[in-house]
Amino acid sequence: MRTFRIFPSILNANFEKLPEEIARVAATADYIHLDVMDNIFVPNFTFDLARSKEIIDASSLPIDVHLMVVNADVAGIEYAQTNASSVTVHFEACENVSRTLQGIRDLGKRAGLAIKPGTPISAIEPFLAQLDMVLVMTV
């Protein structure tokens, strides 16, 4: 039988009570999913790198970072240098997808690739051997 893992997002957490929020999620989850948005690639802003590091370092669970940012080539490597366990970048935001994925993996992290709803799945086929996960957005 397959094992499924739960990756809840903490996007709606009360950040004034972050340690308690993370502990509450940790009681029933396998990972924490951290959505990082820059208000350029997507029309919302969540966390910058410094705040993300605080969240990552406060967690007893592995952190799965999903970067919805421009310049994902640079950001992917920056986030892979944190204590996050995995980093997912958007195909549409990378200038050199293969190099970025390899850089993430070279830093010992799981590498993921996300695509927007309008991007054909065939766009990521050349990179499947470098991927630990794929995220297909629905919004």
Write out the residue ranges for each language-model feature.
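Conserved N-terminal beta1-alpha1 strand-loop-helix module at the mouth
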Residues: 1-88, 92-96, 102-111, 124-131
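Histidine/lysine/aspartate-rich catalytic loop segments that bind and position anionic ligands
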Residues: 114-139
